[in-house]
Amino acid sequence: MALRFPRFSQGLAQDPTTRRIWFGIATAHDFESHDDITEERLYQNIFASHFGQLAIIFLWTSGNLFHVAWQGNFESWVQDPLHVRPIAHAIWDPHFGQPAVEAFTRGGSLGPVNIAYSGVYQWWYTIGLRTNEDLYTGALFLLFLSAISLLAGWFHLQPKWKPSVSWFKNAESRLNHHLSGLFGVSSLAWTGHLVHVAIPGSRGEYVRWNNFLEVLPHPQGLGPLFTGQWNLYAQNPDSSSHLFGTSQGAGTAVLTLLGGFHPQTQSLWLTDIAHHHLAIAFIFLVAGHMYRTNFGIGHSIKDLLDAHIPPGGRLGRGHKGLYDTINNSLHFQLGLALASLGVITSLVAQHMYSLPAYAFIAQDFTTQAALYTHHQYIAGFIMTGAFAHGAIFFIRDYNPEQNEDNVLARMLDHKEAIISHLSWASLFLGFHTLGLYVHNDVMLAFGTPEKQILIEPIFAQWIQSAHGKTSYGFDVLLSSTSGPAFNAGRNIWLPGWLNAINENSNSLFLTIGPGDFLVHHAIALGLHTTTLILVKGALDARGSKLMPDKKDFGYSFPCDGPGRGGTCDISAWDAFYLAVFWMLNTIGWVTFYWHWKHITLWQGNVSQFNESSTYLMGWLRDYLWLNSSQLINGYNPFGMNSLSVWAWMFLFGHLVWATGFMFLIFWRGYWQELIETLAWAHERTPLANLIRWRDKPVALSIVQARLVGLAHFSVGYIFTYAAFLIASTSGKFG
């Protein structure tokens, strides 16, 4: 018999129905379930695929550089970053005739182009790139790295160069190398780039391979380093009148602690950033020597974990047994990695706008909005993935004997208390927040806005004041001019920080009021409910009172027939599926809040947000409806404009989103009947019946249909909001 897809599963390959194709795609990356898999091959396959992943990333970033160099306007943007619109790439085939060509010919280009809202122009400019040649050089270098990655992946699939399982399970060596090598050395190298190339570039010096050995980054060279006079590197920083990219107002300092923002670029001081990376490098280089390997110095992680037993004896055996549990479970390791990466991605979203690191990016409002939204959605998907793999760990890898009475076992033992507390928190937040919004809605509807319940977020305002925000009048810690912390830091970093935090032209510690109080609690509701669903899915993954043998059914099962009295929708996969809807919903509220508050700040009418955000109709009318008007007007009797493409994407996003419900509401029987009718018609239609297929068409399984529905819902949801966000922001601010 000819080899059929999927090669990794003979059982599936012999399936006579279309289930073969869909189940084959669904399990292609579940290496553990493949025929003939061994632990060694599993680790080697994953290791080799990482190189392929790197190759794709390098190819993609190379493409960004290449297209901007070829079709962009980087060199003219560099001359005037605040007024020239950065071009991402040309549009090859602008449909809809001459009006489209005219609408999309912008940014000083000769033909139709797409504008870049990714921030790459600001990033490349900040790190010292200035010409198209620089961009081409970078693109070629990344292409080279991509090729090297592919070769490395192939190389490590050859029998002689396949690492052994013991190599993959050497946790101490891996941690040391990742901490010192990946984080430490790369941070040190980045500090070097900033000091040798980017900082001179910001002062009008063009440093490249041909002259970087001759241009001293600091007038005194390495002298202060070797004589211990490190403070010399911080003396004579750039002045507040410094023009970025020129020597006007420039200083000579390379490692500073100024605090606050560069007045012209509204971004963090480049010398502060270099100092930060040097400190990070030092910490990680030290951290990479913490764990004991062949050299007999440092800690054994197993010893550390086994010693972590709570004193008093009432909290069980602590971390005993965790080392082998984690080290032998790829799902546990992936869960930890995804949880960490999810948190850091969300923190990136929060910090990119509040503490912008790239020159002039703070004044590019559409880019700010796009980057915040982009990173929050990615964080959401990564975090839900962490719980998915945590649940798979409990089903496939958890060994009760090995983890007796340790923290994992105790989580399972106390799951009812954990889940019910989360449930209580979600119910409390939901009913109270909705109650306040609905009450305020009714008061406005009846023309008595003064009867709204408006709660000042005094605790959050107090925290902002403690960090130096003076407008609330709390006079506490850094907002108190007589405090010891204020006086101690006055000559170091505080002037820049206090100026920044009390200046209303940036997004640092925004002034908050009753509208913020309400939406924060709405977001808290979303976060707690998403967490509740995910935690319940993972803690009940092995079994529950309703279905004690659940782990025997695997991660995703539809149900165990009608005889068990309701075993549908309780697999760990179903919890993940439900949680993704809540995650999207929550991030919707987060991005709505961020965007509306910033639009009113940028337009100088912040009172609109303050007055309209305290009741639901305000959100619907003054945020969603008011800002979608440009989209709905993308096509009109007078032809088209540069927002037309977003108007189309807005419509298309709604279409994709709505298609999701078709899969989520109609299940197998409906589709099976429809398929059989269509197959009957096909076989009796002349010409059409010349085309035959080998696999008998059958409907998707319940779980697969849910996945397809969820995918359409998610993609449509994000497409729709992306179009709304970019069009409403760029329509106002260009």
From Swiss-Prot:
P700 is a chlorophyll a/chlorophyll a' dimer, A0 is one or more chlorophyll a, A1 is one or both phylloquinones and FX is a shared 4Fe-4S iron-sulfur center. GO terms for molecular function: 4 iron, 4 sulfur cluster binding; chlorophyll binding; electron transfer activity; magnesium ion binding; oxidoreductase activity. One of its GO terms (biological process) is photosynthesis. Its EC number is 1.97.1.12. Phylloquinone binds at W671. Chlorophyll a B3 binds at M662, Y670. The chain crosses the membrane at residues 46-69, 135-158, 175-199, 273-291, 330-353, 369-395, 417-439, 517-535, 575-596, 643-665, 707-727. [4Fe-4S] cluster binds at C559, C568. It catalyses: reduced [plastocyanin] + hnu + oxidized [2Fe-2S]-[ferredoxin] = oxidized [plastocyanin] + reduced [2Fe-2S]-[ferredoxin]. It is found in: Plastid, Chloroplast thylakoid membrane. GO terms for cellular component: chloroplast thylakoid membrane; photosystem I. Keywords: 4Fe-4S, Chlorophyll, Chloroplast, Chromophore, Electron transport, Iron, Iron-sulfur, Magnesium, Membrane, Metal-binding, Oxidoreductase, Photosynthesis, Photosystem I, Plastid, Thylakoid, Transmembrane, Transmembrane helix, Transport. It is a multi-pass membrane protein. Pfam families: PsaA_PsaB. It is an enzyme of class 1 (oxidoreductase). Gene3D superfamilies: Photosystem I PsaA/PsaB (1.20.1130.10). PsaA and PsaB bind P700, the primary electron donor of photosystem I (PSI), as well as the electron acceptors A0, A1 and FX. PSI is a plastocyanin-ferredoxin oxidoreductase, converting photonic excitation into a charge separation, which transfers an electron from the donor P700 chlorophyll pair to the spectroscopically characterized acceptors A0, A1, FX, FA and FB in turn. Oxidized P700 is reduced on the lumenal side of the thylakoid membrane by plastocyanin. The PsaA/B heterodimer binds the P700 chlorophyll special pair and subsequent electron acceptors. PSI consists of a core antenna complex that captures photons, and an electron transfer chain that converts photonic excitation into a charge separation. The eukaryotic PSI reaction center is composed of at least 11 subunits. Belongs to the PsaA/PsaB family. This is Photosystem I P700 chlorophyll a apoprotein A2. It comes from Jasminum nudiflorum (Winter jasmine). The lineage of its organism: Eukaryota, Viridiplantae, Streptophyta, Embryophyta, Tracheophyta.
